Every structure is written in C-alpha cells, then in structure tokens.
C-alpha cells in the first residue's frame, strides 16, 4: 500500500488497515500476486485499496474506468462505489461520461474552460439547470428560438409551450426540451398533476433497437426523435397526436 509507505517494517495498525482495504475491495486472495499476474479489473481494485489503506477523507479518481471494456466497467464501477461508501471516504470523480456522472454522483460540478458553471444534484442539474450550456451538456436536448407570450408560456416552432418559472423577464430567448418529454401516450388521462400539451406530428422514420424503438416525428417541420420501450403500431407518413409532458426550460 503506497499510501502507507514501501518499507517492510509496517506496524500492526498499518497491516490492519491494509487487510481492511483489501477486504473492502475484494482482493484479499490476490495479496501474493505480482502486477503482471493481475487482470485490468483486478489492477483497478488494487489501486483503490492502496488509496483507501491510509483512511483518507478525500480521494481523487481521474477517469479510473476509461481503459476497461463496457461490461467490466459496469462491474468494477459498482464494486468501487460500494467500497467507497463502506470506507466513509468522499471522492472527487473526474469523468467525461455524463451517464456515468448522473448515475453514480451525489453531486455534479459542470466545468467549462476551467470555470464551474453549476454544482448540484444530478436530478436538479438535469431538470433545472441554471445555464443553457449546462442543460445541453448534461442530456439530450431540443433547443428552439422562443418568444414569451405570457409569464409561463412561450411561442416556438412547435407551437405554444408552457415553461418553468424563471427569474428572467426577457421576452425573447431559447426554450430547451428533453426528448423523453414527448410521448405517444396521454398521461393526463391518468394524472392531473402534470402539464400536458398536444401537437400534431407526422411519422418520419421508425428504428427498432432491441429493448427500445426510436421514432422520428416532425412537428411543424421540426424533427424530433422519441425513444419508446415498445414497438408502436405506426406507419411512416402517418399523422399522429404527440404529447409534451411537463414544461420547457427558458433561457435568454
């Protein structure tokens, strides 16, 4: 454990810390192996154990899974997250994978050109970002020029769209919507708590992708892709009703 020094004369307390770190990361059976005898995933576990051995309050992880294949990355990611939580250490996790950040972080800092744009929980960053750049970076988005016609209503290429409350009094700006806000199912029939707007659309394309189906639609000549968890009974060129659930985000 490099954090405790390379010397052979380790104290009982230091050896106890090493054993605990190895147990946390599931590498106790690898104690006598050399580095070249370890797989990529095992090497990552060893690296985390070395970092945890001194009982640090804070650990920096700089894209630790970038060299692993996707299947192994998911497995090691879960194991490391569990070990970190059990150790009680906080971690700064540097990643360019937004899905990874949204899935595992307690809080996310969005940094652009060395400047922190926003620090917040994943949910708040995704649905209530302070900046348009943050909103576009953190998830798939549809951005359209918009003109405010009421406090919580704008006119855009799609039509009239309700927006979230905003501190801005600007009459012109841009509205941002998430593709998953669009649906072929009117949820307002089962719930009165959600704002739902209806638009007429034309089916442009249908792509079956196994677990999901992507449907490309055109609303007032603006094309949008919708991800669905089933294979819809649709035909290209068909006119359908599309429902926008919730409100858009307005930026000036």
Predicted feature residues:
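Short glycine-rich loop/turn motifs that provide flexible caps or phosphate-binding loops at active sites
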Residues: 2, 39-40, 138, 145, ...
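ABC transporter nucleotide-binding domain
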Residues: 121-151
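Residue-level signal for well-ordered alpha-helical positions
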Residues: 71, 137, 188-189
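ABC ATPase nucleotide-binding domains
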Residues: 1-133
